[in-house]
Amino acid sequence: MRQVNILTLSKALQQLRGHTLSSFECFLSANKLTPPYHKGLNPPAWELGHIAWFQEYWIARNLQRSHGLASDLSQPRKASLLNEADAWFDSAKVAHSTRWDLKLLTPPKCIEYAQESLAQTLELLRNETDHSPALYFYWLVLQHEAMHLEASAYMAQSLSMPFKALWQHEAAIAENSQSTASNFEQQRVDYRTARVPSQNWKLGSRDFSSNSAHDKTPFCFDNELIEKTCSIQDFEISLQPVNWAQYINFVIDTGYRLPNYIRQTGTDFETEVFGSWQPLNKDAPAVHLSWTDTQAYCVWAKCRLPTEAEWDCAAKTLTDFEWGHVWEWTQDTFEPYEGFVAHPYTEYSEPWFGTHKVLRGASQFTHAVLRDVNYRNFFTPERDDIYSGFRTCAL
């Protein structure tokens, strides 16, 4: 969902903020606003404040926003709604480990800040046009909030607390995916693969800043540019991610550890979902797996992960390619495409090149606004708290 339309944007911004506030209320009701330190997550109150801060930083405070990607970042910004906002919520300057020690706003004040930030954003959006370069920043803050919304599910799962991810219904099936959130209650009797022929493949998004008006991609992240041509040799790839039946066979055969939130009960298995244990659906994709876990499985199964280009090609050319239930690890290290130029939010991609692995697809907790076949997610290879799985290619 990357359409340039002010009405669409306005509705999406309001809807997403509603989900963000509902998520915050879950943590508040569960008395989990000050959880134990976790290097991959943030305290919920800091998360909410950061989302509100990020929105006003790039919209209301950004006097250069009308220039879009040509904005001069050296120019001063307007003052924040909060005097302490930059000192509290600027993720580029506030060290992660210190966020647990900050004396932040009370929960009602956090909520008020989030509401005020949204209100001024919507007021400014009403004065924009559908093809204004400024819309880049509105889309940026929308997608940023969707990322943090998904992270709230990671946090709730790690805390084993009750949690309602109401936005799941809106993310059920992405427009350009094939049964992305398939009904895994249906028994899957086989594990299908498909062969993709050798070809030159264009990887990445079109540069919307230089295309003609009728052919513009309204938004993309800087790491998706510049579209490049890759030479792909023919390969065979699974049409679905590895499921629990397959992964548990690997665990039983090798003695490899069970993933987080999975336990064996006699001869069967259960999974913990937001603090509630329930029977494991073995037809569902295996999840909460690190890149390291996928490598161990591939050695055992005599297969490999797809490269990022192979995943991209298969997702866009194979009719029955299912994606969108779990983020899928690829072989590739997160690197810039040739000709990469950082967008105004320079901290988004550039600091992480060379240290993270690329994941493609989406998870069941990825909001519809973030679901896009070109989207490049990236995490360090040991992360298994995220909703990550994988599919395989034949050797």
Predicted regions and their residues:
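Short, contiguous alpha-helical
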Residues: 10, 15-18, 25, 30-90, ...
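Core domains of carbohydrate- and sulfate-ester-processing enzymes
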Residues: 75-96, 190-199, 258-277, 348-363
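Short aromatic-cysteine micro-motif
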Residues: 107-118, 221-254, 271-318
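Surface-exposed recognition segments
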Residues: 225-228, 255-260, 322-395
